């Protein structure tokens, strides 16, 4: 890794801006929405059986857009049952956005929300120190396992937090996505550190199998328009490139040979296709649903 490269996560405002651009340019949330509309209701049909309150834990929930969609489906599947929703999210900006979203949302009268500004590791440490293990009927970790130091330990801990019939839902980039190729080839040259791990759903499936965990996997086709990355001086393109490489100001700070190689690889068939003159990146996701033992 070149010591002049800094993780995008070291500049929180830039990370949030690049993430918002990523969502605008990709079908990330749309493909999750399709999954929530079609497959998700069946997945949560058995959670919280015979309980008066369904306990939910969101890890790295961001601004809550996907959370509220899932809560809506859980409400439909379990009418009249109260929901306690605990949110663990390290970003103050995202928590503010989540609270604003809740304030505008209808039909949440039976749902209580509690926000905890902390990382998943901090939450785990707090639970262990207080020795007050709380069990949850549904735990979700969407696009966040890149940001933990010890993935297998994190999986084991949150799996242990599941109540009877509980489900742990994980969403990550697919092992057949453009991300996988990009990370495997260039990860050693990018600012891989305590802030970010280059891990795919394929890696998670292997870890869960080695634990003897029961789980199911679902593939979510998704793409992202990265055409602007190839336009010189285009700020949106530069921000998207930051997000793709998890590097702060990659275009300006990366060595010329690395920059050219990554731009070349982003256009390769392993990463992208060309459609109507646009470069469309393979952003495929995988959903993994883990069951309690």
UniProtKB/Swiss-Prot annotation:
Q: Which residues form the signal peptide?
A: none
Pfam families with a match to the protein in the record: Methyltransf_23
Gene Ontology terms: cellular component: cytoplasm
Q: Show the coiled coil region(s).
A: none
The record's principal subcellular location, in a coarse class, is: cytoplasm
GO molecular function terms noted in the UniProt entry: histamine N-methyltransferase activity
Protein residues bound to substrate: 28, 283
Q: Which family does it belong to?
A: Belongs to the class I-like SAM-binding methyltransferase superfamily. HNMT family.
Full protein name: Histamine N-methyltransferase
Species of the source: Xenopus tropicalis (Western clawed frog)
């Amino acid at each position: 890794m070149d010591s002049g490269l800094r993780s995008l996560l070291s500049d929180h405002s830039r990370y949030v801006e690049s993430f918002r651009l990523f969502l605008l340019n990709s079908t990330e949330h749309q493909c999750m929405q399709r999954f929530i509309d079609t497959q998700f209701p069946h997945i949560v049909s058995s959670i919280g059986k015979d309980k008066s309150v369904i306990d939910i834990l969101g890890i790295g929930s961001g601004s809550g857009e996907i959370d509220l969609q899932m809560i809506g489906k859980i409400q439909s599947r379990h009418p009249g049952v109260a929901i306690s929703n605990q949110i663990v999210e390290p970003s103050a900006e995202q928590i503010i956005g989540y609270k604003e979203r809740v304030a505008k949302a209808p039909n949440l009268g039976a749902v209580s929300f509690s926000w905890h500004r902390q990382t998943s590791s901090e939450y785990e440490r707090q639970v262990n120190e207080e020795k007050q293990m709380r069990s949850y009927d549904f735990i979700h970790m969407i696009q966040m396992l890149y940001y933990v130091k010890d993935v297998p330990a994190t999986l084991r801990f949150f799996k242990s937090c599941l109540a009877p019939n509980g489900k742990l839902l994980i969403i990550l980039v697919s092992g057949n996505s453009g991300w996988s190729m990009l990370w495997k080839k260039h990860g050693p040259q990018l600012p891989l550190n305590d802030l970010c791990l280059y891990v795919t759903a394929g890696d998670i499936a292997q870890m869960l199998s080695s634990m003897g965990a029961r789980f199911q996997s679902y593939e979510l086709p998704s793409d992202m328009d990265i055409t602007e990355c190839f336009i010189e001086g285009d700020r949106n393109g530069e921000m998207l490139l930051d997000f793709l490489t998890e590097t702060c100001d990659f275009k300006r700070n990366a060595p010329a040979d690395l920059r050219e190689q990554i731009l070349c690889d982003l256009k390769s068939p392993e990463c992208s296709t060309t459609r109507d003159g646009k470069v469309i990146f393979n952003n495929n996701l995988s959903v993994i649903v883990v069951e309690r033992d």
